[in-house]
């Protein structure tokens, strides 16, 4: 084995599925949001052989000898029967989940010997998938690391910040590292070899269905099963159920049995539902209230209106416009679709597709054989869809494979090895002797005698027991809701700022008007904040000049350094980002993440500081460093490297080397020395419409 650069699990699928002969060619539809392409067997083989280094560009033609030679190389590498033909076994191997690094030839590499030079490796779980409870995800990652610590001197310690060696992230599509995911059943995950910055990090595609390899894991609340997960399928009144149901209840609250036979065992719990609670937000875990009013319109279900990140939310009072209380709706992972253009939404049955009614998931219209459903009653009209739940991918096994790459391992050519390119589910011990030889070549054996790695995931995931009253039948309604939001949930917006804004200035005699140049200026919580050497003033524009301060920055944001370069607040999530040198701090209310290095955002070493930020709406922000800028995604907290632009071209008339770039009252300000240039965007054209003094014209200081 040899270390290589990022390792990407890929699921390639054929353009046609096995089916009985039909009198006519089946209709294949282009589904909105679907990145899969329909390929013939030969096209698939040519693309596969080229992508993984078995053929060259010039050979991608009708040259049968080149194709046969490439197939033999592939078959030899993957320990397949060496026929040189595009046979069934070879095609199945090409369809299987696997890493995307070439098997032959060179790939872009990082510098160094690509191993860690310390034995205590730290890791940080930056965010979570909604497919599994957080404690189950924590456990899966811990067991995946234990696979490698069992046979080496390495130890793995969880930390809670970006200083970690290995940062674990769930993301979708373009997530900031230049290796985008491509939706359901495409790229599963990738990892980078050991080293600084992004090296060592592991990313997982959040459009996949993450399970323990045997179907969805649905935690229960209340009932009489002490929080045990649902058991699918289960029997109720002689009928089999493979998802949560509202049958037997008059309040339409979904429930499930936690054993295979409710009729015999009578053990049950309630499935995640907005009827029980809404998570995160500022609604204190209370259930959704339907109908509720938002922007004058009545809503009787959860909605994504008003949000650009696709999260479903609801009001926890009857009038959001008045009370501003909300939460995010729990995802029904037992029935929620993945991928497509409606991830997280449940299937709607029956639905209309090409004029025909469907009451179950179908393969019709697809060339890859995957089951799908509409998430509205009429696909022909609404074009809303997703893939139906399946067994999913074992987060434990995929993580163990990816962490092998994060430790410096390349792929194995032994089919039984964990580091073999293709993913396969197993409940046995994941490590093969080839894996052990590879990792011990890098780090040596564990000093204890003959340790054994973990053998299998637990039969039941750890869960949090419900605090509600026990009940005896699913026909009975729970008498109390949960006391707070569940552990799992989106990372979306708490709306509250710090618990208390300071009201008493440090030194009221310290006049803001005597400051010539500020360290940073930013609009935060509807006030324009002026930062200088560990202090700040708040300014609001109204009748007369209204300035409060100075206040000590650590009294509001304790982790911040004395000198700031820039800051901004995201209007959707209410997260506040502070930049100083090559570091960034992210505050959500009183909670902070950081300092993080700028390279974790995707900004290279040439970016020595972030000199300003302009929110663009929709969770996007322009980050500036002198004469360059990049588009920053607040949700993934990464920049799009392809978005780099020139300030001179985008904002003509603005001087060189500006600082304190900020947005105020929907206009952009570029400061240089004591002056500012205000930019107004009319008809998508940026024009300087005002030049003035920061103190005299913005702060309305008197001219002495």
From Swiss-Prot:
Ca(2+) 2 binds at residues 165, 197, 199, 201. Belongs to the peptidase M10A family. GO terms for molecular function: metalloendopeptidase activity; peptidase activity; zinc ion binding. Keywords: Calcium, Collagen degradation, Disulfide bond, Extracellular matrix, Glycoprotein, Hydrolase, Metal-binding, Metalloprotease, Protease, Repeat, Secreted, Signal, Zinc, Zymogen. It comes from Canis lupus familiaris. Residues 1-19 form the signal peptide. Its cofactor is Zn(2+); Ca(2+). It holds the Pfam family Peptidase_M10. One of its GO terms (cellular component) is extracellular space. Matrix metalloproteinase that plays an essential role in local proteolysis of the extracellular matrix and in leukocyte migration. Could play a role in bone osteoclastic resorption. Cleaves KiSS1 at a Gly-|-Leu bond. Cleaves NINJ1 to generate the Secreted ninjurin-1 form. Cleaves type IV and type V collagen into large C-terminal three quarter fragments and shorter N-terminal one quarter fragments. Degrades fibronectin but not laminin or Pz-peptide. Glycans are attached at residues 38, 127. This is Matrix metalloproteinase-9. Exists as monomer or homodimer; disulfide-linked. Also exists as heterodimer with LCN2. Macrophages and transformed cell lines produce only the monomeric form. Interacts with ECM1. The keyword Metal-binding applies. Zn(2+) 2 binds at residues 99, 401, 405, 411. Ca(2+) 1 binds at residues 131, 206, 208. Ca(2+) 3 binds at residues 182-183, 185, 187, 205, 208. Residues 20-106 form a propeptide. The conserved cysteine present in the cysteine-switch motif binds the catalytic zinc ion, thus inhibiting the enzyme. The dissociation of the cysteine from the zinc ion upon the activation-peptide release activates the enzyme.
């Amino acid at each position: 084995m040899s270390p290589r650069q990022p390792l990407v699990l890929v699921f390639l699928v054929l353009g046609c599925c096995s089916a009985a002969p039909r009198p006519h060619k089946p209709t294949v539809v282009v589904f909105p949001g679907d990145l899969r392409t329909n390929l013939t067997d030969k096209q698939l083989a040519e693309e596969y052989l080229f992508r993984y280094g078995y053929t060259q560009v010039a050979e991608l033609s009708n040259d049968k000898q080149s194709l046969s030679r490439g197939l033999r190389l592939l078959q030899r590498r993957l320990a397949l029967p060496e026929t040189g033909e595009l046979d069934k076994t070879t095609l199945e191997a090409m369809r299987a989940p696997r890493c995307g690094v070439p098997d032959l030839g060179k790939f872009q590499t990082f510098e160094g010997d690509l191993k860690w030079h310390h034995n205590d490796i730290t890791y940080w779980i930056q965010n979570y998938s909604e497919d599994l409870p957080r404690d189950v995800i924590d456990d899966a990652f811990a067991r995946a690391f234990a696979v490698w610590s069992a046979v080496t001197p390495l130890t793995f310690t969880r930390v809670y910040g970006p200083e970690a060696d290995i940062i674990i992230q769930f993301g979708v599509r373009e997530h900031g590292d230049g290796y985008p995911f491509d939706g359901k059943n495409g790229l599963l995950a990738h990892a980078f070899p050991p080293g600084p910055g992004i090296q060592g990090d592991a990313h997982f595609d959040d459009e996949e269905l993450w399970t323990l390899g045997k179907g969805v894991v649905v935690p229960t609340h209340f009932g009489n099963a002490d929080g045990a997960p649902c058991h699918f399928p289960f029997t109720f009144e002689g009928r089999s159920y493979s998802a949560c149901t509202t049958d037997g209840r008059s309040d339409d609250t979904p429930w499930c049995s936690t054993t295979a036979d409710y009729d015999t065992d009578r053990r049950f719990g309630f499935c995640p539902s907005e009827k029980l609670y809404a998570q995160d937000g500022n609604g204190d875990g209370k259930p959704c209230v339907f109908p509720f009013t938002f922007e004058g319109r009545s809503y009787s279900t959860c909605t994504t209106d008003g949000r650009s990140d696709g999260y479903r939310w609801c009001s926890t009072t009857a009038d959001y416009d008045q009370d501003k209380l909300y939460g995010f709706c729990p995802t029904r992972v037992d029935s929620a679709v993945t991928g497509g253009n409606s991830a997280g939404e449940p299937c709607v049955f029956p639905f209309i597709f090409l004029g025909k009614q469907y009451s179950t998931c179908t393969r019709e219209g697809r060339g890859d054989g995957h089951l799908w459903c509409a998430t509205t009653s009429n696909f022909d009209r609404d074009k809303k869809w997703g893939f139906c739940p399946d067994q999913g991918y074992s987060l434990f096994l995929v993580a163990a494979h990816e962490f092998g790459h994060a430790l410096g391992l390349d792929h194995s050519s032994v089919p039984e090895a964990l580091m073999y390119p293709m993913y396969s589910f197993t409940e046995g011990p994941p490590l093969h002797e080839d894996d052990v030889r590879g990792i011990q070549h890098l780090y040596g054996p564990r000093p204890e005698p003959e340790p054994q790695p973990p053998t299998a995931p637990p039969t039941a995931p750890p869960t949090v027991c419900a605090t509600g009253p026990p009940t005896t039948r699913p026909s009975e309604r729970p008498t109390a809701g949960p006391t707070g939001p569940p552990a799992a949930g989106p990372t979306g917006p708490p709306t509250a700022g710090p618990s208390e804004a300071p009201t008493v200035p440090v030194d009221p005699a310290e006049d803001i008007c005597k400051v010539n140049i500020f360290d940073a200026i930013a609009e935060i919580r509807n006030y324009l904040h002026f930062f200088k050497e560990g202090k700040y003033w708040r300014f609001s524009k109204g009748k007369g000049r209204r300035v409060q301060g100075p206040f000590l920055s650590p009294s509001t944001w304790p982790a911040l350094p004395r000198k700031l370069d820039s800051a901004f607040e995201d209007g959707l999530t209410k997260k506040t980002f502070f930049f100083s040198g090559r570091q960034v701090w992210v505050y959500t209310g009183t909670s902070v993440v950081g300092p993080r290095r700028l390279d974790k955002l995707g900004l290279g070493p040439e970016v020595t500081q972030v000199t300003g930020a302009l929110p663009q709406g929709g969770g996007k922000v322009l980050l500036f460093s002198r004469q360059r800028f990049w588009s920053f995604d607040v949700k993934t907290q990464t920049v799009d490297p392809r978005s780099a632009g020139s300030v001179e071209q985008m904002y003509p008339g603005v001087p060189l080397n500006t600082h304190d770039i900020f947005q105020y009252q929907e206009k952009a300000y570029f400061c240089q020395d004591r002056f500012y240039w205000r930019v107004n965007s009319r008809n998508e054209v940026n024009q300087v419409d005002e030049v003035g003094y920061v103190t005299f014209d913005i702060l309305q200081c008197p001219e002495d």
